[in-house]
Design a protein with these regions (language model features):
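Gly/Pro-rich hinge or "lid" segments in bacterial periplasmic/extracellular proteins
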Residues: 192-246, 251
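Aromatic- and charge-enriched surface segment that lines or borders ligand/interaction sites
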Residues: 111-155, 177, 313-316
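Detector for C-terminal structural segments
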Residues: 28, 34, 229, 327-356, ...
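N-terminal lobe/hinge region of extracytoplasmic solute-binding protein
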Residues: 4, 65-116, 147, 218-219
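Surface-exposed binding/hinge segments that line
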Residues: 114, 122-124, 160-203, 227
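A bilobed periplasmic-binding-protein/Venus flytrap-type ligand-binding module shared by bacterial periplasmic
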Residues: 237-240, 299-322, 326, 335
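Ligand-site clamp/hinge motif
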Residues: 239-285
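Append "and occasionally in soluble cytosolic enzymes with long acidic Gly/Pro-rich linkers
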Residues: 317-412
């Protein structure tokens, strides 16, 4: 989904997608091969290296502390679409499937998954899995948990992932069968995200409207929710009845530090042992601090400019192309991302295409949006469109340089080609509303958005431009595009699906439905006391904190 506060995708619905094989369980891992294990950060001159992982923990801990940039408004899994929620929730609530640190698919609460026909998924559950409040997981809990995602009254962030679901039924004490309205190659992949979370039916019903904001989440993960000091911190406690490997730390303290400088100072002073989503302006400071290590990993993330209104000036594709041609992408990577990224003309990351045949992967990245500025051509397009002097409004925020400096870059680009680009400042704690509230987007034509895939498949992002899609804020509608999305979704064969997705990528590029800017890796800082956290975006859904232990 969009990441909202840290604009990314993951919105209520961020269509995150992984390659899936609707007909054969064996294809699950093969279809979503992860990105390269190590190496440079992509094409071009990179100032960073990708690490496959951090060193494994050598021992256990009594506790460790983790800095997060915002307090989650709720930890209800049906609303978990942004970084703060998922960073914490992934350690408490588990899904039917599991996204591994290598960004591949593995069994989760479902020990076995089969697809006897293109419109059926059967999940055989692990036995003797305990909820945090003491109950034992059954098929009834799964049916109830997925049902909450499908209930329109709940306005679930993941509702779009269930649009092709006809029924979810109990087919045995520890077996659940999902019937689809039509083949959906993506559905099972999303069962590794918060869309596939299983919580106790009894626990949710007992909590009522307070579920997710106080008391137990009554899930099955290696940690259970401890204290929640509103506005300050959340503490997780190790769940000793966990069905899998026990967490290495007895406690985890998540500290809400909204100010970027305060967050970095906490990591350097030891107040926080580590954190994800490191402010880009602090990469160098942390790297040279001597108190720990800054790692970069595959983020399946692209930094884009989300076009939210096509009824005004930006309704003319020539104006969108002009802004794109005037953008200094390389300059933004140097300043906004501190050199840790690469300019791109693709809305999707290269790693999202890891499982595609080489020729299809090559085709997907040929002839896309130019990344080098062409001011003369951009000026001509603005003039042709009769848009000279017209106003375009872009949202900005101090939430991070990836937002503020990109907004400034858009303003500068507009000024160079005859557009009047105005900045509208949004408070960091209100930025998420751009993804959830149409009123918050009123008067805004564009905003910076870092989109991360929730599954290892480009359709996760490209499906956002289908008519009625959650993140289709501009209301783009193209029947031919919609038909291609449907065909790609239904394609069980990965080669066929990626071929269709390459066509979608070309259309999205030609129309500049969003303006692509850069690929951006995940960053994680660990001080010398701890190690074991994954370097990849997997931490959004994988119980990463359970792997963190003593470095000595």
């Amino acid at each position: 989904m969009p990441r909202s506060q840290r604009p990314e995708h993951r919105s209520p619905h961020r269509r995150h997608a992984l390659p899936a094989a609707a007909l054969a369980a064996f294809a699950l891992v093969a279809a979503c091969a992860g990105p390269p294990k190590t190496g440079d950060g992509g094409s071009g001159d990179q100032a960073y290296k990708l690490s496959a992982d951090t060193p494994a923990a050598k021992g256990r801990l009594d506790s460790f502390s983790w800095a997060v940039y915002a307090e989650p408004p709720t930890l209800d899994y049906i609303s978990a679409f942004d970084y703060p929620q998922n960073t914490i929730l992934s350690n408490v609530c588990e899904s039917l499937m599991r996204w591994t640190p290598q960004l591949t698919l593995a069994p989760g609460l479902a020990a076995k998954t089969t697809s006897p026909d293109p419109t059926t998924w059967v999940y055989d559950l692990r036995p003797d899995v305990h909820f945090h409040a003491g109950g034992v997981m059954t098929a009834d809990d799964v049916v109830y948990s997925l049902g909450r995602q499908m209930n329109p009254d709940n306005a679930a962030a993941w509702a779009q992932q269930f649009q092709n679901v006809s029924t979810v039924t109990k087919s045995g004490p520890l077996q659940v069968t999902v019937k689809l309205k039509q083949p959906d190659s993506q559905f099972n992949q999303y069962m590794a995200t918060a869309a596939g979370v299983v919580a106790s039916k009894a626990g949710i019903e007992a909590a009522g409207k307070d579920y997710g904001t106080s008391g137990s989440l009554d899930c099955t993960g290696p940690y259970q929710l401890g204290s929640w000091n509103k506005g300050q911190s959340i503490q997780l406690r190790r769940f000793d009845a966990y069905w899998g490997a026990k967490a290495k730390s007895a406690k985890v303290d998540f500290r809400f530090l909204t100010d970027p400088s305060a967050r970095v100072n906490a990591m350097i002073s030891g107040e926080a042992d580590g954190g994800y989503l490191i402010p880009t302006e602090s990469y160098d400071r942390l790297s040279r601090s001597g108190v720990g290590t800054l790692y970069f990993g595959e983020g399946l993330s692209t930094v884009n400019v989300n076009v939210t209104d096509m009824k005004g000036v930006l309704g003319d594709v020539r104006v969108r192309k002009a802004l794109s041609l005037a953008l200094d992408r390389s300059g933004f990577v140097r300043t906004g991302l501190a050199g840790a990224g690469s300019a791109t003309g693709s809305l999707t990351s290269r790693a999202a295409w890891a499982a595609a045949p080489p020729d299809v992967r090559k085709e997907a990245f040929e002839g896309l949006t130019p990344t080098a500025p062409d001011i003369d051509r951009a000026k001509a397009l603005v003039k042709e469109a009769g848009a000279t002097g017209k106003t375009v409004t872009v949202a900005t925020s101090s939430i991070g340089q990836d937002v503020s400096l990109l907004a400034t870059a858009v303003q500068s680009a507009g000024a160079r080609i005859g557009l009047d680009v105005q900045l509208k400042t949004i408070a960091p704690n209100a930025f998420t509303a751009l993804f959830t509230d149409a009123k918050a987007r009123e008067g805004i034509d564009l905003f910076p958005e870092t989109y991360y895939d929730s599954i290892t498949d480009p359709l996760d992002l490209l499906a956002n431009f289908k008519t009625g899609a959650y993140q289709n804020f501009a209301g783009h509608s193209d029947q031919a595009y919609d038909d291609l999305v449907d065909k790609a979704t239904a394609a069980a064969d990965p080669a066929e699906r990626f071929t269709l997705e390459a066509q979608l990528q070309k259309t999205a590029s030609d129309q500049l439905l969003w303006i692509p800017v850069a690929e951006w890796p995940t960053a994680v800082f660990l001080n010398k006391r701890i190690t074991g956290a994954p370097t990849t975006i997997s931490y959004m859904y994988y119980p990463w904190a359970a792997d963190v232990g003593s470095a000595q």
